[in-house]
Amino acid sequence: PGAIQIVERLVAWADVIVENNSTGTMDGLGIGWSDVRRLNSEAVMMSSQLMGSHGLQADWTGYGPTIQTAGGLSWLWAFDDGEGPPGSNAIHPDHLAGRLGAVGALAAIIGRDRGASGAHVEVAQVEALMFTLADHFLAEALEPGSVRPRGNASPDGAPWGAFPCAGEENWAVICVRDDDDWVRLRKAMGDPHWARDPLLATSIQRMEARARVENGVAEWTQTLDRAEVQDRCQAKGVPAARMMFCVDQLEDPHLIDRGFLVDLEQQALGQIVMAGPCFTGSRMGPPAIFQAPLIGEHSRRFCVQDLGMDSVLVDDLVASGALEALDELP
């Protein structure tokens, strides 16, 4: 009971409530949208579930890597060789849904400030993902069977993709956009005999012989460090980049020069490096980047100063376990 009391006070105080629980969880706790409207008619609530709050599969649970299957991305990323999708632990559908939800919540706040009431914004993660593949759905609708698993291949040229380099799990990406790029790549590779074949002179010919061409490029890249592949290609004007691990990004001269990497002193951890803002503006202030609080660090202050709760009541809630408070920093 005490915990619900805190949550209800929080809802009454808040402008925006964001929830990312499985379908029905908030209603079951007594803080669903109807409860939010009763407690605070001006509040905006943003909900994001895997498949949405209603529909035949609304009870499915999961996150980014799992929704890639239902959203069609795993199939599209597979290689067109009859084998199953290799799978991916990429979580970018989570980022898509979160950012769309934030935009929706901000739009609802703007609407409220212009005279509208509070609103409930919903983002189904599967729909956010499928929206990014809209051109593929349109192409398949216009020409059934035209969309196939692509792997790393591109319809814009060949060779194009990630190529193995010397060492364990080291790769470099090379993109040959046109015939001029192909001539430049041949020079970067030392113009091997197989690459001089006139049957590989045009983009169409190379795409038809994609496996042969990319196997030939892979034989070359496997003899070199990934950075060497990148540098040799870029020196000839061919788009290429090494695959970077996190430790590489921390030492990347370009990211350092742009000031993207932010050093931060984090309590209980020490010095850490954070990613900076993904966009900046000439009329925007510096990003608000600060150390994370410890669990319960601000509980008492927030309940008393922001929610207007009596300090004795807060003590009782802490003692009952309804509220966690950190009274002394470690």
Predicted regions and their residues:
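Aromatic-enriched alpha-helical interface/lid elements that frame and gate functional surfaces
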Residues: 159-236, 240
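Flexible, small-/acidic-enriched active-site or ligand-binding loops
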Residues: 201, 268-316
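Active-site-adjacent "lid/gating" segments in soluble enzymes
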Residues: 8, 13, 21, 25-176
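PLP-dependent aminotransferase-class I/II
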Residues: 1-6
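Amphipathic terminal alpha-helices
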Residues: 312-330
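A glycine-rich dinucleotide-binding beta-alpha-beta segment and adjacent secondary-structure elements
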Residues: 235-289
